[in-house]
């Protein structure tokens, strides 16, 4: 497997575009992704009980066997907007279907931005028309820009691998910066591939991959009303997968997982106001569930995140988060490392160099390892530090 250029348009048969429709003052705000051959679609949606209109429509459409397009607007979430919001989301589907000549049941729709504000429908529909006209094999970067809200950088990646003498590609774009918390919430990610497989297998694979990637990130502990991860597989590589035992499936899942983790880490790294990425590794746990729960809990701890920002080796905040994660632990078995600096052994503090620990916490990517010494299950979660700028950004988000 190797990294390539092209994002969501790297796989065969995919086009994309991103345009400025006027929802935002000057930046791109409407994106369309289109598969020239109807693709098998799979998706995972936010677990927030309050779901935006586009999410409800996409949850219905994903039941269809085939998905040909994804339409997205940023700058307005179209959430908590009542019947007017549902009508607006349907109009987005109608306009996209008309422009591309496809059934509206083959379209996923997504929105992201401020909650509770009516969607400026005419601007969005005009943007959809412009985006459909601008669709190209080079449009992934523009689409990645058009789905951004408080993101500081667009997020896209693509990889390819060889199997059965053919080349398979997987590409993706994502957005997310604030309101990021585990359990499939607060971000959008769209992944394309030219491999072919049945819907049930694709959906199962996506769910497993999401649990290892997007569900393992946290920026601020808030779960959004709008977010989803979707994957479209159009089969144009000529490689068709029927079972999990096949070499092609194993290579595809590995590629999908790589793309998803790269996008998830990019979201965590770009957390609102963040200055560094935090990676928490929980090793030698009794179960995968326990390892994941503890890793997510530590990355979500505001006290720990603030300590990382201040380069303060306050490991007490880590062990405290381990303790309130809701899992059975034996403190006397636990070791904790800040990078390479061991600060806790068998539940007892060790003397360590504050300077060395500070150096570890000053890195762009801070790694914390929590060894439970009780089993063989491991998990990794990602987050970011908590800074003054996070408060500044969110104190005036609407205005």
From Swiss-Prot:
A GO term for molecular function: L-glutamate N-acetyltransferase activity
SUPFAM superfamilies: DmpA/ArgJ-like
Record-level GO BP terms: L-arginine biosynthetic process; ornithine biosynthetic process
Ligand binding (substrate): 149, 175, 186, 272, 394, 399
Cellular-component GO terms for this entry: cytoplasm
Active site: 186 (nucleophile)
Keyword flag Amino-acid biosynthesis: yes
NCBIfam families in UniProt: ArgJ (TIGR00120), PRK05388.1 (NF003802)
Binding partners and assembly: Heterotetramer of two alpha and two beta chains.
Name of this chain's protein: Arginine biosynthesis bifunctional protein ArgJ
Naturally occurring in which organism (per UniProt): Carboxydothermus hydrogenoformans (strain ATCC BAA-161 / DSM 6008 / Z-2901)
Gene: argJ
């Amino acid at each position: 497997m190797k990294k390539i250029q092209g994002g969501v348009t790297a796989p065969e048969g995919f086009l994309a575009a991103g345009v400025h429709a006027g929802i935002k003052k000057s930046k791109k705000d409407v994106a369309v992704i289109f598969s020239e051959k109807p693709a098998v679609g799979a998706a995972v949606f936010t677990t927030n009980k309050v779901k935006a209109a586009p999410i409800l429509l996409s949850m219905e459409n994903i039941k269809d066997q085939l998905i040909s397009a994804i339409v997205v607007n940023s700058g307005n979430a179209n959430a908590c907007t009542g019947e007017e919001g549902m009508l607006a989301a349907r109009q987005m589907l109608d306009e996209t279907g008309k422009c591309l000549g496809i059934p509206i049941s083959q379209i996923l729709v997504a929105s992201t931005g401020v909650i509770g504000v009516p969607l400026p429908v005419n601007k969005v529909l005009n943007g959809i028309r412009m985006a459909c006209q601008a669709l190209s094999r080079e449009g992934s970067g523009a689409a990645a820009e058009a789905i951004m809200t408080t993101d500081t950088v667009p997020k896209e990646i693509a990889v390819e691998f060889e199997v059965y003498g053919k080349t398979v590609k997987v590409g993706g774009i994502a957005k997310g910066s604030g309101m990021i918390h585990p359990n499939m919430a607060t971000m959008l990610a769209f992944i394309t591939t030219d491999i072919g497989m049945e819907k049930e297998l694709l959906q199962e694979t996506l769910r497993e991959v999401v649990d290892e990637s997007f569900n393992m990130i946290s920026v601020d502990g808030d779960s959004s009303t709008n977010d989803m991860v979707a994957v479209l597989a159009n089969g144009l590589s000529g490689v068709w997968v029927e079972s999990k035992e096949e070499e092609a499936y194993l290579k595809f899942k590995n590629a999908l997982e790589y793309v998803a983790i790269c996008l998830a880490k990019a979201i965590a790294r770009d957390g609102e106001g963040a200055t560094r990425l935090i990676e928490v590794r929980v090793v030698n746990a009794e179960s995968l569930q326990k390892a994941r729960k503890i890793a997510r809990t530590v990355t979500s701890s505001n006290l720990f995140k603030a300590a990382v920002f201040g380069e303060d080796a306050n490991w007490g905040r880590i062990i405290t988060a381990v303790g309130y994660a809701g899992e059975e632990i034996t403190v006397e078995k636990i070791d904790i490392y800040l990078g390479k600096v061991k600060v806790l052994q068998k539940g007892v503090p060790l003397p360590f160099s504050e300077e060395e620990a500070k150096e570890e916490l000053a890195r762009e990517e801070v790694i914390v390892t929590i060894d439970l010494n009780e089993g063989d299950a491991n998990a990794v979660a990602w987050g970011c530090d908590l800074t003054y700028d996070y408060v500044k950004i969110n104190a005036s988000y609407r205005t």
